[in-house]
């Protein structure tokens, strides 16, 4: 974890198929990275904290955690507003069950099979960007108990924490 990766822009497939890999990367500066596709795909033992990563420049997270069967870490604070490709992102990530309701997925055009086979994912995604998204959602929750809500989060909705000061009804109308 002492590597200086601050100038790296492409981390696609970096730990793909590294089945025993489970090292701490929490202090990595990934703020310049634009591609994280397949980064942890089939890294079946990986389950470390990435919550403080600055992923605001990333555009491609396709298959990022696909088949990362142990991964179940909080990613709720990630700024994914630049992401356009999220297809298969958590496909067959069989332990993943974190709340992503407040992700800004408004730029995403591909959510195809995003949670396909993510058998532990029991969340109802109810943030404004999820509800209003026009992305390709083919097979998004195939073989997964998760779903996208037909209405926007309120404080009483299980799994959806309303952010303080935000008025989701106004956001829907704007």
What does each model-found stretch correspond to?
Residues 1-174:
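Negatively charged
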């Amino acid at each position: 974890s002492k590597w200086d990766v601050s100038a790296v822009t492409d981390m696609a497939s970096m730990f793909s198929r590294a089945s025993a890999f489970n090292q701490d990367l929490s202090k990595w500066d990934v703020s310049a990275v634009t591609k994280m596709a397949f980064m942890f795909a089939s890294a079946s033992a990986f389950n470390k904290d990435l919550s403080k990563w600055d992923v605001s420049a990333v555009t491609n997270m396709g298959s990022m955690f696909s088949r990362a069967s142990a991964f179940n870490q909080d990613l709720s604070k990630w700024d994914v507003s630049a992401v356009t490709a999220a297809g298969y992102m958590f496909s067959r990530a069989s332990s993943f069950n974190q709340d992503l309701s407040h992700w800004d997925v408004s730029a995403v055009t591909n959510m195809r099979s995003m949670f396909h086979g993510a058998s532990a994912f029991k969340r109802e995604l109810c943030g404004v960007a999820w509800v209003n998204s026009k992305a390709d959602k083919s097979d998004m929750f195939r073989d997964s108990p998760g779903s996208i809500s037909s209405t926007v989060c309120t404080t009483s909705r299980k799994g959806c924490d309303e952010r303080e000061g935000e008025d989701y009804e106004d956001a829907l109308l704007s």
